[in-house]
Amino acid sequence: MKSYGLSLTTAALGNEEKKMAAEKARGEGEEGSFSLTVEEKKALCGLDSSFFGFLTRCKDGAKMKTLLNKAIHFYESLIVKAEGKVESDFFCQLGHFNLLLEDYSKALSSYQRYYSLQTDYWKNAAFLYGLGLVYFYYNAFQWAIRAFQEVLYVDPNFCRAKEIHLRLGFMFKMNTDYESSLKHFQLALIDCNVCTLSSVEIQFHIAHLYETQRKYHSAKAAYEQLLQIESLPSQVKATVLQQLGWMHHNMDLIGDNTTKERYAIQYLQKSLEEDPNSGQSWYFLGRCYSCIGKVQDAFVSYRQSIDKSEASADTWCSIGVLYQQQNQPMDALQAYICAVQLDHGHAAAWMDLGILYESCNQPQDAIKCYLNAARSKSCNNTSALTSRIKFLQAQLCNLPQSSLQNKTKLLPSIEEAWSLPIPAELTSRQGAMNTAQQSVSDTWNSVQTASHHSVQQKVYTQCFTAQKLQSFGKDQQPPFQTGSTRYLQAASTNDQNQNGNHTLPQNSKGDAQNHFLRIPTSEEQKIINFTKESKDSRSKSLTSKTSRKDRDTSNICVNAKKHSNHIYQISSVPISSLNNKESVSPDLIIVDNPQLSVLVGETIDNVDHDIGTCNKVNNVHLAIHKKPDNLSASSPSSAISTETLSLKLTEQTHIVTSFISPHSGLHTINGEGHENLESSASVNVGLRPRSQIIPSMSVSIYSSSTEVLKACRSLGKNGLSNGHILLDICPPPRPPTSPYPPLPKEKLNPPTPSIYLENKRDAFFPPLHQFCINPKNPVTVIRGLAGALKLDLGLFSTKTLVEANNEHIVEVRTQLLQPADENWDPSGTKKIWRYENKSSHTTIAKYAQYQACSFQESLREENERRTQVKDYSDNESTCSDNSGRRQKAPFKTIKCGINIDLSDNKKWKLQLHELTKLPAFVRVVSAGNLLSHVGYTILGMNSVQLCMKVPGSRIPGHQENNNFCSVNINIGPGDCEWFVVPEDYWGVLNDFCEKNNLNFLMSSWWPNLEDLYEANVPVYRFIQRPGDLVWINAGTVHWVQAIGWCNNITWNVGPLTAFQYKLAVERYEWNKLQSVKSVVPMVHLSWNMARNIKVSDPKLFEMIKYCLLKILKHCQTLREALVAAGKEVLWHGRINDEPAPYCSICEVEVFNLLFVTNESNSQKTYIVHCQNCARKTSGNLENFVVLEQYKMEDLIQVYDQFTLAPSLSSAS
């Protein structure tokens, strides 16, 4: 870190001597500048980003805002006087202050300066949280997600973890990553800490998430469960009833259409009883009345909708449809014009308007309307519109020009209609609404300078910044509506494309302003279109302001990139590369590829919980660091080498509050090591006097367990480490950037390493093993393996499988049959990365029947094609001409059978015995296979799985679980085509997934080879024939498709190498940061390896020993903290073949000390929680018992006995 003359300690919190000296040095220039009294400094010292959204809950919230403004001027004046040569804490604190005043551009600027000056910025959770809030405000969701995930990674007990989970839930929901969204909503729901949303509001969003996923019965059950809650807030109840009404109108939940509409109307009427001013409920009610033919009631409801809320393009479009049904074309025209003037991109209104003109025999105007509809990004039937436009144009060409000119028009042309006056009720209503909103908005945002933001975006921000009803005083009304109201109304604006009566309208911009967060369903592939205008302004503001303010002082700036889903991706780039467009990196903050940090705690007493504060002190120890010139992430190959393995352990001082403190998590203090205390200053910006800083603890992996535990005890009765198992000195995990220099284009299709076996001796030749596990070979194809070893592949044929176990379960993935290596959207209009496949289950017998029928059908189709050769050449030329632009849709549906478990030795004895003929390094079980030391079966990893395929069946892109190697043998009779990308390019594919709103780890995706070629990503491509074995090396990315009818068997292998262990642990930590379960329990496995294996490779030994050291310390400190808090630890030893325990809430591995609810313990179900989730559920752990699976003496013995074994060469 760069250290300068003026420190935050001197400016705000230093001792009197330092302050007097500083004041004397400043001399007369201090006069006339802003100054802070001692009391004001004390009031400010505890404020950081964790108060965002909670400041108004203080008794003196208004006075605090005034003080914040004063403090900002004070700090800025000091920075000016020091010519910018101040310590980094100034900028971090300025960022916090500006954030609390909602001046986001200034907050971002200050945070950027802090980042550029502070080398280990990632240790400061409050900084990361504030940065995430700013990115969230600017709708830079991918950046906000990264920042929030890093907060939870470095500090799982961060006091605003619940707020983070809420925001992550919303962002993943907007990105259509519903599984991740649900997980974070559930994590927020179990947290008992204070939050800006109540538990019932969180439950509502979980219910709506089910609805968005089209899990309507689950959504209905969740909504009805909410209605059973006594004293349910009126606004929540109204919105729940609204959603139930709309679902009954749209979905086949019960009975016939008449019954559906009756229930829908009843629910909506009840909703209006709770909230008669809900324009959305009135609109939905109008739709229901229109559906059953109650025209007058529908008109009345639509009128009420316009009166109760902002004018909506949806409403006016529906009114137009109603007029058109009543044969009132002029009134319908006027309503449609209102709709498209409110939202120029309202595809449904343009289509309905085109239908109206066409019905009035005005094809020219109809064509214009259809063209506007087709240009709209919300249009989902472009192909049908295009066909209709061509048909009408052909008709016009056949008509004489005179007939067109002399024809009487029933309606004004589109140009004339556009100029007609809008109904007075619309203009007056819209003008009054905008005026009122602007007035309230200006009052509330008086402290902001970003006045250019739209009303829509201000509402959006206020909701998500926790300025809901609870944030205001009893007599003070929030601007517009409360946060909960906005949250609920946002979710209630549902998909309206499911009623078949007419072409349905989409939400207009006006409607988006009223309901800031339009939640689309999976059918609508137009994610967050409602925020496009605000994103334009915010992204431009973000770029211009930061570049203008920080161009000379920061090494990063913000660059907005627009992507196809209309979300602006923000990229962080070095200032020096601004003029080089090719050097822009997609990373949020460019850092080295991470390992991990363990945080050790110390007790702090007298914790205050008055207003749900964050009881956390940010101790920034300002040691001198040299900022690396190149911040680009290194590849994983070098990320955890022996050079970076620190054998001398320097602990971060991650201090925690007392272990048992009610209504609070383990509120932490983020500290940093004191490399140079003489030239650095420890700054306390917390609410209370700074706690005693824990001295650095230095132990080596070669230290005995006695020395390790003694060093732990020397820290006193400390708190808890976070259980990470890599290094302390590196930031949170990050995907690697693309290797540099990039490969030339001619090397992007490299030849696949292949080995041809002629006999059994070749298969057992030792260099074959070394060739396969060499990190330079991402994949190896061993040709002719089955023949060389005389394997009976017929044991795995479909016929034999049916005879052996015909009722065995098969997981089926229903997919679309795509052309060649491409992946098109269902309409066949564009290539996409998202690969749709739905999961179900069947039996081997039924899938075998499907496989056989598919083959017979293919034979029939082939015969039919041969008989239709007369048009073959024409069809061929047409297809080749269009191959690059579109594909004929709809695509045929096929089914792929996967994850067929062959682990049961009793059922599959012959099959499993046959595989023992394989060489040891590819066997399912062997001493040199790490997965054989897990101690229990992990299906598909240390056991065999089988896939049954038909042509076109695909396994989407992925890396193996925890980056282990993979073995795949093609049984035949058909071939498979493989696509493989080396491990060090997985970061590039992760970026592509993010740009396409996909989760690299959890989503189904099929890469576009053209995108990879443009990004200079090499792709190995080869055919796997029957009897060939494909070895996928550690971390290799791959995707596969069948080009014939075939079966495959597969399992994972873990070579006993440092490279394999390193990648496995890196992925373990990346999974933890991404809130994804690691299938392989690396902590449990590491201890078993120490028990069972003699390791002679120094690199591998050091990594395993380091893991043992970290976990031994974690167990010791956690156990001592529990005992000191009076919490009894009960013995609960492990049994043979017992799976490693995982937290039932967050799915992280839990080692040794298990937190189990009292109820679960008494029922012997043992539902496990990790310490973090246990404390969030029950602040003082009163509802939990702690079970211990290993005696500390046993762990100590394993640790001491695990030593570096002599290598074979040295032994000889």
UniProtKB/Swiss-Prot annotation:
Zn(2+) binds at residues 1143, 1146, 1170, 1173. Residues 907-1070 form the JmjC domain. InterPro entries: Corepressor-Demethylase, JmjC_dom, KDM6_GATAL_sf, KDM6A_B-like_C-hel, KDM6A_B-like_GATAL, TPR-like_helical_dom_sf, TPR_rpt. It is found in: Nucleus. Residues 530-539 have a biased composition (Basic and acidic residues). SMART domains: JmjC, TPR. Its EC number is 1.14.11.68. GO terms for biological process: cardiac muscle cell contraction; embryonic organ development; establishment of protein localization; heart development; heart morphogenesis; heterochromatin formation; in utero embryonic development; regulation of gene expression. GO terms for molecular function: histone H3K27me2/H3K27me3 demethylase activity; histone H3K36 demethylase activity; metal ion binding; RNA polymerase II cis-regulatory region sequence-specific DNA binding. Keywords: Chromatin regulator, Dioxygenase, Iron, Metal-binding, Nucleus, Oxidoreductase, Phosphoprotein, Repeat, TPR repeat, Zinc. Fe cation binds at residues 958, 960, 1038. It holds the Pfam family KDM6_GATAL. It catalyses: N(6),N(6),N(6)-trimethyl-L-lysyl(27)-[histone H3] + 2 2-oxoglutarate + 2 O2 = N(6)-methyl-L-lysyl(27)-[histone H3] + 2 formaldehyde + 2 succinate + 2 CO2. Binds TLE1 and TLE2. This is Histone demethylase UTY. It comes from Mus musculus (Mouse).
